[in-house]
Amino acid sequence: TTDRLDDLAAVPPADYLKIDVQGAELAIISNAKAKLAEAVLIQAEVRFLPLYDGEPGFGDLDRELRAQGFLFHDFAFLKRQALQTPSSARLRRRAFRQAVDGDAFFVRDLTNVGDMTDAQLWRLAVLAQAVVGSPNLALFALDALAARKAVPADAADGYLALLPPAMLREA
């Protein structure tokens, strides 16, 4: 038998969940509502072409995560393949456009940032940089914290100063 994640007392609530369980992501996430109630980031394997019978697709997982207050943000990676036709063998890999699977980042709904605590915004800023590699998302969280006066007004300036110059627009 399988236990629901919400029923496992030894598992604490999560700030960030990374999950890759060969097609069972939806079943696990839908049974982890309490554990994910304060989470700010989920990284889940998503599938666009099924590999397993009855496997949920990206849309199924997206619907569940939206119901739990998350929105798709970006892909950590996305694997593509050629559509198999008699002529497709003549194409280079970069011409393959059919999305197969990948890892997707879902973040707490940023249109409702007022519902997030300062602690959640802090965690989001850190995870945005350390896990997602998204300076834009990190700045979003820092600016929201600055608007609440939870960080110094120049916190974003300090963060921007740490980024490689190639990531910044010229002044």
Task: Identify what each model region corresponds to.
Residues T1-L5:
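S-adenosyl-L-methionine
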Residues P135, L139-E170:
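Short, charge-rich amphipathic alpha-helical segments embedded
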